[in-house]
Amino acid sequence: MPGAVEGPRWKQAEDIRDIYDFRDVLGTGAFSEVILAEDKRTQKLVAIKCIAKKALEGKEGSMENEIAVLHKIKHPNIVALDDIYESGGHLYLIMQLVSGGELFDRIVEKGFYTERDASRLIFQVLDAVKYLHDLGIVHRDLKPENLLYYSLDEDSKIMISDFGLSKMEDPGSVLSTACGTPGYVAPEVLAQKPYSKAVDCWSIGVIAYILLCGYPPFYDENDAKLFEQILKAEYEFDSPYWDDISDSAKDFIRHLMEKDPEKRFTCEQALQHPWIAGDTALDKNIHQSVSEQIKKNFAKSKWKQAFNATAVVRHMRKLQLGTSQEGQGQTASHGELLTPTAGGPAAGCCCRDCCVEPGSELPPAPPPSSRAMD
């Protein structure tokens, strides 16, 4: 981390609803919620992360430093922290609001999708994560549902959400960070070894794998066997799903999904790989195969995530704000930072009367042998 950062002293508000009109609950976690809201002064739509202060007891000092660092993050592919309020028993983090929806939805809706499209997506993720790493920030939970489109425009950029405040968690609780999405976690995290920025590079490799075939590289109904696969870095480029994918793409993934974190590519090295920086990413249309597998393996009925990007798209289309210009305060949304809970609104949440089904962990996909194409 950078050295101790001054500030920012959050603003005091007697009632946050005097400033913001709460519209909808976008996500819920153990001690927090993400709310879609409108600034009553500017009519700007934002995402407000409401954090129960009791969840931060004993961590106030580190919290101030972490939020100060978040406040300084300015990158075109990372959601921004605009403001902070304290009111009653909660902190309110005012975040940008993304309006473009989820990564998988966009891919499925496209009629044409290529390796080059996937390469452009991964380039944006690598560039943003390199920026975080240069600041000493490790995301630790990169996954497709944390990649959201900035706007409804066809050429919209991708945005990384849901990062940074994980640093406020007990650094010894490595497994608690991974349990919600085991398929994306680096081997050293599962082995409960000290880990570094390299864990993010592994996760980017997993995301690249999924973007090129539509299913995750690791699967087993039994968590222990799933973890064993990850610990050994056992994955395949299965036929026929990878037959039309370039050797360069596979080489890129192998360098990121390298078991040894010391040998694993850094973001800087990955950005220099020919599949990203060169012209080796193919232009062949792989939409049918990839979209079919995404629909099978990441179906909405099975995948209930903590952040509801669909609700944002619905609101944006209703208000005809989905294509706001970047320079005019177009907003992007921050996903859920804390581990989701089951069974109702978040404990200690700021809107207990809101009826929202909390997110649950991403289910594993069927093994390659049972993924016969229709």
Swiss-Prot record:
Organism, as annotated: Rattus norvegicus (Rat)
Activity regulation statement: Activated by Ca(2+)/calmodulin. Binding of calmodulin results in conformational change that relieves intrasteric autoinhibition and allows phosphorylation of Thr-177 within the activation loop by CaMKK1 or CaMKK2. Phosphorylation of Thr-177 results in several fold increase in total activity. Unlike CaMK4, is unable to exhibit autonomous activity after Ca(2+)/calmodulin activation.
Protein kinase domain mapped to chain residues: 20-276
Subunit structure: Monomer. Interacts with XPO1.
PANTHER family: SERINE/THREONINE-PROTEIN KINASE
Protein name stated in the entry: Calcium/calmodulin-dependent protein kinase type 1
Gene name tied to this protein: Camk1
Reactions mediated catalytically: L-seryl-[protein] + ATP = O-phospho-L-seryl-[protein] + ADP + H(+); L-threonyl-[protein] + ATP = O-phospho-L-threonyl-[protein] + ADP + H(+)
Record note on modification: Phosphorylated by CaMKK1 and CaMKK2 on Thr-177. Polybiquitinated by the E3 ubiquitin-protein ligase complex SCF(FBXL12), leading to proteasomal degradation.
One GO location term (cellular component): cytoplasm
Region entry Autoinhibitory domain, spans: 276-316
Motif Involved in nuclear import location, chain numbering: 263-264
Function statement: Calcium/calmodulin-dependent protein kinase that operates in the calcium-triggered CaMKK-CaMK1 signaling cascade and, upon calcium influx, regulates transcription activators activity, cell cycle, hormone production, cell differentiation, actin filament organization and neurite outgrowth. Recognizes the substrate consensus sequence [MVLIF]-x-R-x(2)-[ST]-x(3)-[MVLIF]. Regulates axonal extension and growth cone motility in hippocampal and cerebellar nerve cells.
Assigned EC number: 2.7.11.17
Location (main, coarse): cytoplasm
One Gene Ontology term of the molecular function aspect: calmodulin binding
Gene Ontology biological-process annotations: cell differentiation; intracellular signal transduction; nervous system development; nucleocytoplasmic transport; positive regulation of dendritic spine development; positive regulation of muscle cell differentiation; positive regulation of neuron projection development; positive regulation of protein export from nucleus
SMART domains in the cross-refs: S_TKc (SM00220)
Superkingdom, taxonomy of origin: Eukaryota
Matches recorded under Pfam families: Pkinase
Residue span of motif Nuclear export signal: 315-321
Enzyme class per UniProt: transferase
Compartments, record wording: Cytoplasm; Nucleus
Region (Calmodulin-binding): 296-317
Domain description: The autoinhibitory domain overlaps with the calmodulin binding region and interacts in the inactive folded state with the catalytic domain as a pseudosubstrate.
PROSITE patterns the record matches: PROTEIN_KINASE_ATP, PROTEIN_KINASE_DOM, PROTEIN_KINASE_ST
